[in-house]
């Protein structure tokens, strides 16, 4: 996995960028599992999400397929108090800018569960279209796609 080391992308007080030096102390539960997988995953690219200067979560591209130009997206905010404030929507919008401006990817995909309405709202606000059920879980999984326009 590549951990972003370049400039931060900003939208007001929200930004995505490189992790702080003591990364593991700031990431939400489960994120450390992604980091431990880093050496064996060349198909991942991750950012830390910041609210002002405070790390609040992560957002990443994973299962990046350079041949098809597609990538899945994962994201999480650590504290419940950080949810419902638009941070996830802004972080996803910033990731879309990064992808459009610096990669050759042509499609981003979010797979979420039917009961994760917050993730569905984030996807819709950022222009992702619901394209149907997921192959892995057709009863509960929902697929949202965004075509990169340059």
Segments predicted by a language model, with ranges:
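Acyl-donor (CoA/ACP) binding surface of acyl/acetyltransferases
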Residues: 1-29, 43-150
